[in-house]
């Protein structure tokens, strides 16, 4: 099978037209997936005379988890920095704009040009974090991923830009497989 990854509408539409599946970038929110990505894939499929049947979507999600408040906070800091890094990229601005956060992209881009990488993460509010990431205790992750994406994706790829206990991920993956 051939898959393409993307964020922008044109690449996404091309993937719908010529591929067997699409890999959503981690910098994709549920709203962006439903309102931009899936319609673009459907347009591409229609151009090729195909439906979405059998087409696979690999869904995105940052995951912020830990067994206590200190672990959750450490995970949140790493994830905020990664979201900020992606958010500084002008090509990804439409994702932020969809949520009314276009001005945050301007600030992130300016800070990136100044080399202020750590400061960038402080611009990612709790609202932004919770929009891009599933945040919670390990037992809350699989149900929330399923709630957000279970009806529109066939596979999930999650991103956790921080170190943590491998056993925690085993539990999350087992819960996802049984969901």
Model-derived features with residue positions:
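Active-site-adjacent structural elements that line small-molecule/cofactor binding pockets in enzymes
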Residues: 1-179
């Amino acid at each position: 099978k051939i898959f393409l990854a993307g964020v922008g509408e044109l690449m996404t539409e091309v993937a719908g037209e010529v591929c067997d599946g699409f890999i959503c970038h981690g910098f994709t929110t549920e709203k962006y997936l439903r309102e931009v990505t899936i319609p673009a894939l459907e347009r591409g499929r229609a151009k090729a005379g195909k439906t979405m049947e059998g087409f696979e979507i690999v869904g995105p999600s940052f995951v912020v988890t830990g067994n206590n408040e200190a672990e959750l906070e450490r995970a949140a800091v790493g994830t905020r920095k990664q979201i900020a890094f992606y958010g500084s990229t002008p090509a990804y601005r439409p994702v932020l704009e969809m949520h009314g956060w276009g001005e945050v992209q301007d600030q992130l881009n300016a800070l990136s040009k100044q080399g202020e990488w750590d400061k960038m993460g402080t611009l990612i509010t709790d609202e932004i974090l919770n929009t891009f990431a599933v945040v919670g205790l390990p037992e809350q992750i699989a149900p929330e991923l399923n709630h957000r994406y279970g009806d529109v994706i066939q596979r999930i790829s999650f991103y956790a830009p921080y170190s943590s206990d491998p056993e925690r991920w085993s539990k999350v993956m087992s819960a996802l497989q049984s969901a």
